[in-house]
Amino acid sequence: MTGKDIQIGQNISAGFFFRCGHYGDDVDYAIITGVVIRKLECYNQVLVDVDLEQSFNSPGKSVWVRLDKADFNINN
C-alpha cells in the first residue's frame, strides 16, 4: 500500500521504529492509532493525529509515518 491508497480522515494503526536520544543515536518502537490529517504522496508519508490513550510509546501527538517503513492497518 502507498500514500495514494489512504484518504485523509481514515483511522489507521501503525507500528514503526523511530530515532530518539540526545543525538538521535538510539532507536525505539511505537505503536500508534489515530486519524490521518495530511499526506505526502511523493514521500509515501502520512501525518497522523495520534490518540494517545490507544497508542503505545508515541513520540508525539502528531506523527509523520513512512508507510514503506511501518506495519500499518486501516481501521475503517
Located regions from the model:
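Intrinsically disordered, low-complexity, charged/polar segments
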Residues: 52-76
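Short, cysteine-centered beta-strand-loop-beta hairpins and adjacent loop/turn segments enriched
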Residues: 19-26, 55-59
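A short, structured loop/turn motif at beta-sheet edges
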Residues: 5-7, 39-42
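Short aromatic-glycine-enriched beta-strand elements
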Residues: 42-48
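Mixed-charge, Lys/Arg-rich low-complexity intrinsically disordered regions
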Residues: 1-23
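Short beta-strand-centered aromatic/proline hotspots
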Residues: 23-39
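A short beta-strand signature
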Residues: 32-35, 48-54
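Small side chains
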Residues: 3, 14-15, 30, 34, ...
